[in-house]
Amino acid sequence: MVIEVVRIGQRLVRDDRVTTHVALVSRAFGAERIFMTEINPEIKDTLGKINDTWGGNFEIEFIDSWKPIVKKKKEEGFKIVHLSMYGEKINDAQEEIRKEENLLIVVGAEKVPREIYELADFNVGVGSQPHSEISALAILLDRIQGGQQFEKEFPNAKRKIIPTKTGKNVQVKETRD
């Protein structure tokens, strides 16, 4: 399954941290790429450093507008999943979404244009109360992958966490500069 995420907009200042966390969750929970509009370029640098240290090749692509990428992905056969607290319950939609091969998940920051609701193949709600888009994305990604994203290996990692019941164990790969 190919999973990509598009982040629509950003509320100035307050959202740099939230948008960074949307990208981090996307990466850690199995997405291959995130498309972002109106973003502080430092976020791309941060994610580049994460890839360099922790491995993987997660991509960030800056876009001028969400609409062309959503339409293009739809034409390529991607199913569009819009995260919205107004959508159908995730418990009711997750099985059908799991069957899809390619997904583009839309995560809004500001008021989402009505057109997104119409373009989406799935409008999915993680609870019907106000909540964080970060938590909604994490829950959706976990539900549709059934926890398998946690088995993913991140190639070329300089550091790797070794799960342990107590303490912490980080394997550090020696590098020569």
Swiss-Prot record:
Reaction catalysed by this enzyme: cytidine(56) in tRNA + S-adenosyl-L-methionine = 2'-O-methylcytidine(56) in tRNA + S-adenosyl-L-homocysteine + H(+)
Keyword S-adenosyl-L-methionine among record annotations: yes
GO cellular component: cytoplasm
Function according to Swiss-Prot or TrEMBL: Specifically catalyzes the AdoMet-dependent 2'-O-ribose methylation of cytidine at position 56 in tRNAs.
Gene3D superfamilies cross-referenced by the UniProt entry: 3.40.1280.10
Keyword ATP-binding part of the UniProt annotation: no
EC number(s) from the headed UniProt entry: 2.1.1.206
Broad enzyme group: transferase
Subcellular location: Cytoplasm
Entry-linked PANTHER family: TRNA (CYTIDINE(56)-2'-O)-METHYLTRANSFERASE
Species: Nitrosopumilus maritimus (strain SCM1)
Descriptive protein name: tRNA (cytidine(56)-2'-O)-methyltransferase
Subunit details: Homodimer.
GO BP field: tRNA nucleoside ribose methylation
MF term (GO), any: tRNA (cytidine(56)-2'-O)-methyltransferase activity
Signal peptide region: none
Binding site residues for S-adenosyl-L-methionine: L83, G108, A109, E110, K111, V112
